[in-house]
Amino acid sequence: MENSNSEASAVWNPALRTDDNHETAATVEEISAPVSSDVAPLTPKATTANTDIVPDAIDSINTESPAREETAELPLNEHTHTVPGAAEPVNVGSAGFIETAEAPPTAIDDPGAVPVAVSPNGETSAPAIATDVTSVSENTVPDVTESSSVEPTALIEIAQAESATGEDFNQAETREEFREEAAELFSAAADENQETDAFKPQAELAAAPGDGYNNLQSMQEEHVQEGQTHQLEIDTSVNAAQGSSDYPTPGWVYQQGIADHATPIDGELRSTNHDLWGSPKSVDNGEDRFFDQLRTQTKPIYFPSEESRFEEGVPLLDGSAEAPVEAAPVEATPVEQAVPQPGQLDRVFEGDEDEDDGFFSSAQQPATENEPQEPVHIQRKSTSQVLDSLNTNRDGVHSPLSPTAEEFNDIIAAAASKSPENVQEPASEEDLAARWQAELSDDDLEVAPVEEDLAAKWQAELDDDDLLLEDEPSDLAQNTAAEVVNGHGVEPNLQALGSPFGTPQNPSKPKPAQSVYTPHQPSTADLVQSVPIPGATPLSSSAPYSTSYFQPRPEPPAPAVRAESFAERPKEGYKSPYDLPEDLAPRRKPATKPVVSSAANVPAPPPRSSSFTAPPPPQSSSGVPVPPINAATLPPASKPNAPVASAPKNFYEELPLPPVRPRSRPAESGRYTPKFNTASPAFVQPPPAAHPVTNPYAQLSGDTPQSQLQQPEKLGPYANNVGSSSQSAPAVPPINSRYSPKPPTLQPGVKPPASPRYSPAPPPPAAASAPLQRYTSQPSVIPGQTVTLPFQPRTSSPLAHHEKVSYQPNEASRKPSFPQPTSPVTGQPSHTETAAPMSPRSSQVQASGPSAVDTSSSYQQTSPPRNPYAPPSYLEEFSRRVSHVNNSTPSAYTPPPETPPFVPPRRSQTQSPTQQQSGPRLSVPSVDPLKRPASVHAPSSPTKTSHTYAPMQPSSHIRTISQSLEFIPPSDGQELDPLQRWKGAPIFKFGFGGTVLSSFPKHVPRYSAGQTAPKIKPMPGDVKTTQLKDVISFPETIVRHPGPLRNKSKKKDLVAWLSSRIAAFENEGVPQNLQAYPDSYKRRDEKILLWKAVRVLVEHDGGMQSTPDLQEALRGILFPHLQTNGLEPMYSDSLQSFGAEVINASSLSDSAESKPLSSIRNNLLIGEREKAVWSAADNRLWGHAMIIASTLDKSIWKQVVQEFVRREVRSNSGNPESLAALYEIFAGNFEESVDELVPPSARAGLQMVSKVDGHGPSKDALAGLESWKDTLGLVLSNRSPEDHRALLALGRLLLSYGRIEAAHICLIFSRAAVFGGPDDPQASIVLLGVDHVHSSPTALLDDDAILLTEAYEYATSVLGASPTSTLPHLLALKLVHAWSLTDQGRKSEAQQYCDAITAALKATTKQSGYHHQHLFFGVDELSARLKQTTGDGGSWISKPSMEKVSSSMWNKFSNFVAGDDSDAASTGSGKGGETGFGPFAQISGTPTVSRSPSVTDLYGQYPMPVAQQVPGAGTSRYQPNNQNAPNSSPDQGRGRSSLDSQRSASFGLSYGQRRGSQEYGHPSESPMYGGGPFYGSPTAGYQSTPPQTSYMPLAPVEEDMAQQAYTPPTATPQGLFGHDLPYQPPAQNPFDQSTGPEAPASQHTEADGYMPPTGNTGYEPPASNTLEVEVTEESEDEKPRKKLTMDDEDDDDIAARAEALKKAEKARKDREADEAFRKAAEADAKKPAPAKSSWWGWIKGGNKEEANSGKPIRAKLGEESSFYYDKELKKWVNKKDPNSATPARATPPPPKAMGPPSRAASGSSMPPSGTAGLGSRPPSVAPPPSGSPAPSSLGLPPTPGLGPARSASTGAVPPAGNASSRPGSSAGPPPRPSTSLSHASSIDDLLGAPQARKGATSRGRKKGRIRDLPHLAYRSVYPCIANYQPPYIVVNLHAISSGSMAWLLVL
């Protein structure tokens, strides 16, 4: 024993002495001789590392855990004492200073070496010790597994490894106290135990520089180089016992006797004797061996005297197996007691476990807790520095112990007292090794047991270290780990010790701890990695020890107790460097991870290189999550670990593997694998093999990161790789997502322990896929490195290699969603990537911070495996710690194998960029620090970043800039073109009919001698002709639109098309045109409602009459969930919007409840008003009942009033707005009803606060808008006289808030909406669903909107049996649609639309301002071009023939006047092409032009008047003078509208002139005309026209004016179809009704053919005169009407004059009418007898006319029979004849009378009424309000007058005003056209097509009937003839035929 002790002391002293003075070195030499083979000497470099390392370590560790930040310097006695827990004697003589810091002292060259300063006297420098001890107490239990002649840094490193756990031996005590306690413990031990050679003075040790010492040093250096950490199981207490010259194990321990301090900081007591355990020093040999084994474990292969060391180690281990308690931290509760030896050792572990502050476990837990503090990167001090720092204690071993030292001693004593039996009993080497490993693993000591048993246990304990973080997450894991740690029945106490140091599960982990300090750790890491491979398999009961990271899953089964923890341990192993301090905190002891014995291995790699930093990153990803997993999984695993005692052999077998480290590094995934193992059992035990690695990775990420974080802290760039490999290696399996390919490889048998960090390079292929999975996106950064990485494990941190490898696979995996679920991809990739990129240790140190840890752990987490495999507890823990990391990891996981090639060249883990990423991952700092070296993490983040983008790069093959070839410039000056157009560019030309011409330039390469690259000669390319539809896909509907809609046969097809479009809208998302609006979803739903509403109208033939079916259909679309046939409760349920109860309903006794209101509301929705009344009465809602009853029979009202007891209290129930609005409507407050929805204050932008309902939640003032459907449904189901006004107000309200679709629904159901062009300020609707006010003009080009509006027009006109088109402005939009069809190549359909437009223009005699030249030309042009392109063969320019032209012109003119088909032909597309095109194209259009022109002339005035505004407008319509000049100029000036652009400028002008003059005098109109975008003039015209000039004919104007005069809404609600203006003036409708029948006919006649003459001022006055005469003769009935219109016109001219004229006109008309009737009666009475036979003919002819005439005809018809009887009697004759004669004449007269009077004074008088009052267009504007009444009249759809009224109102009303004003201005001409036009138009509309008029013309003319359009036209001409000689007329006609309108105008 003494020899062994001396050897051990040599070993210890060398390590200590290296730090110490020369004396120590001598002693070390002496002692090291025997031990040298086994133990790597600790380099005293660490001495300086204490101070130097601490800052760096703190930097790296801070992120990981505060524990790391602290370093524990323990004084070692000069004399080597065998610590019962230590396999080797510890040289206490040299002041052993163990610096434990979360970050491995990068300054220390030997990762395994812990800087220990031992004074020659065996004292450690007090100050240094104080500080160091404090850190040790807080963060780590200094373990001195090995001593290096030069460096005691191994001890320090061990301490650091334990400190990596993040817990101090005694967190509560300061370092000084700890040192003091340790010194006391050591002194006590020295006193009790006989001094052995081990305790010889350092001088002796130095004197014995024999082979042992030198060998140890050399070996240690080798280990450092190898990256293998030497885990010297020297109790920190030994170091702490600065004052004791000897290290008496048992006695010393007993002296301390404090159970709390039962466990030395190391977690192992290394005294010459196993006095600590109460066993004699006989154990010394075993202890020596044990430490040798630990060193060997770190790098056993490297010791030449490895076998001897093992031999010594066995006895020492045997003796110390029990004895070495691994000084469970004072706080640590004995988690693991060696089952084999329940002696003091067990007790010690118990105490540690109970305390739960086991040094390692506490370190681990504190690491987690301290994680936020980010352990300082500890750099090893040089031996001299350590010695200097220890100088204070150098005075003597017996120098007073610092409180920390005393505490340490107490811990040791407690441990000895707890398990004295174990200490005394020298267990067999295997038993000792197993127990020792268990305990060491608990403590996370870096002592490698000699035997594989020890290795297995060691791994388990190291796993515990790895689990340190996990231990915090799950106590279960810790407990299980404790049980498993011993595997021999080690008590939880022992496990507690183990957990403080590391999970006892990983016997090999002690080495990882060494690896933290020594380069050997890579070997340990390899071992750890071997465990990670098992980790790939479920870690849960696989033997962690046997699994040693080198063995695949098979190993884990053997040490099933720790298998899980082992795999995870590796990550813990990263912690293990930190675990020394953590071991102090037994919290880690639970060592759920002990099962993952691999953790032990993990620590080794981390020790040296800054990988310490890297561990933190892994921690965040895998580390954080791992703890829960390890805890949960490891406990079971730890139990198996105990049996795994045999595993240590495997462990040593695996040790040889370190040479293969390249693979093991790839296997670093193995490091993660342990994590996987831990996690795997919970979630993915079956998949663990390869993908399990990924899962394990996720799970391991929790556990492993801790150990990884710890170990990596000390690891050098490569040591980090090893360390993080070993400890974070368990994480590798989780990294499997990251390194998943590798972990599988490692598990199979690759010795991952050391390699995981660096070995990733070899395995990258296997692991690469996993890394790719994890970092799939990052490979791009790695690609270059990938190849080298496999072979550069050392050159760059293995993590870097793994990153790349893992990232590449991850890249693929990241793409898959699977990895994403696991955790955020970013975290994962960043972790690995950072580690890899950051090779420098400095960066490692940086990374070592929690952030670094976070990064790496996040990296691990990134792998999806964590989610799939990690146990919930693990995930929760991890998520709590590293939520950020988790987020990043998920995607990376899926394609783990993907990226082997990307593995970047390894970077020193010190550089690990993890720190960079660590910042974000600080949430998991404690875990990360423990988990992995910073370097590991650092590579992760860079890799992550690179991979994150790398996958993108690989996926999108990097595109290099295409070689720019030189062009051969031209020599003709084109080369000077700054645009270089000579190089050529694609050319596209869009032609008619969707034809596209394209030409791409050709670049011909020209090669010349001596040039490698050719020059480019641009050449013109081929011209290709394609169809636009082949280039641009136009939306196709399943059902083709059946348009144009011209007859009822299209109804079925239209409904099918509407249904298909609605279905498409419902299946589509928000249209692009609505996405910019905040309420886009509401707008989308309302758009669908609008389409459904139009479909309902089509299905019900326009809904002209309200029927139950129609109401039901409307309710179906407004309230799809409402079932009218259901019970009220059903309604209340289905209509929650109506009856939703308010939680905060008013508590007033009389307040209405929401349920009764819902019942009332629902009853009203279905039209059951009486039921609603009694429902309200039953619920005591008397106010509701009374309001509803007021609309019912008086009897019901009386009953309700009798029942009514108290006043109504407004209900506070939800959504009362719609009911309140309905009640307002019932009360007659139509316009104010909308205030119930949105209060005026809200519309004004004010927010009002209610003091009444303050108890309820504040309500959005605009929330009432959402009740528009309820309000509409209530109104439609409960119609009241003027409710359309309320709907109009509601529509306007919605329009003001941009709810276009909802507003249009309300407007169309109000049947009073004004449809007009975009230039019409009165128009509320231009196209359904389009906001023409705020939207761009292009919105009007929407085909869907055009077709929907066409469908509405079809429903209301064709299906509604309306005689005329209700939307004259829509013709121009149909033309736009025709052009759109042409562009799409649908020429036949476009031609159909042209024909339909032409027919519509011909069909109506009263033309709207929208029917202008531009429209005519546009239709003709498009039709002609379509005919040419469709193969008519006709040329664009037909050979002109004067005969054809003249004949066609004359025919067209006559047809135009008569409205015959010939006219249609002239204007129609049929022949228009022939006659209209060519040089005389405009002549051919002249008929059209002549129509327009005359109109144009009329409107030509308007353009001028438009500018003039009202007066101009009014006069201009009828003023020929203005019309003439303006006619041409206005059109031209106006320029073309969008449509007009295609046409001649005159097109726009004519329209504008016409409408402008008619519609408005307002400047607004004129600007609109000028700018009329769409229709050119129509724009202005549209706005004005719908209301005023919707009907170009003057007659309509008269009607409109008359109607306007009749402001009352007598007209029926047909306004639905009419424009607001037409319908708005109800007066028009009633007036039209009376006069309409006759006047319309005349209007049409004049309008169609007659308008041009009207336009001519020359003959208008005469016409008016003549007409007046005729009117008086033919029909005086219409005169009254004319009076109205004339009055309106007069008003336009002059208010006073208008009024006077009106009065005069009215009186005169009345008189004339009476006279006419009298004369007619008399004439008839006279005629009857002679014309008896002919009388029948009169009757026949007259019947038709009489039908038109109306009452007189009917009465006469009845009298006819009497007439026969009384043929001779004049009475009979007088009665009948006058009646029959009068009716025919009477009918014509009104138009005539209208015409002349309106043109003349009468005409002017009428216009004044309309004009003056309405102000031309302005009146129409005013009409909107009147329009509401008009709508009501309109609401009377049945009224036949409506057709005319509607048409008239549409445009006629404004025309009336205009006409009136115009007549006023030009008294003569306007009246006549207005008269005839207005009547003709209305009559024509009612009677039908102009053809009938045609026939009647001759008769009509004779009879003076309006129907005879030709006659009317001539009649209008006749007055001119009467006034002017025929030559004038001839000239006029000739001028028309020749196409020169100027003559006509002049005349």
Curated annotation (Swiss-Prot):
Composition bias, Basic and acidic residues: 565-574, 1694-1727
Record field: compositional bias (Acidic residues): 465-474
GO BP term, pick one: protein transport
Record keywords, A-Z: Autophagy, Endoplasmic reticulum, ER-Golgi transport, Membrane, Protein transport, Transport
Disulfide bonding pattern of the chain: none
The protein's role, per its UniProt record: Involved in the initiation of assembly of the COPII coat required for the formation of transport vesicles from the endoplasmic reticulum (ER) and the selection of cargo molecules. Also involved in autophagy.
Family per record: Belongs to the SEC16 family.
Name under which the protein is recorded: COPII coat assembly protein sec16
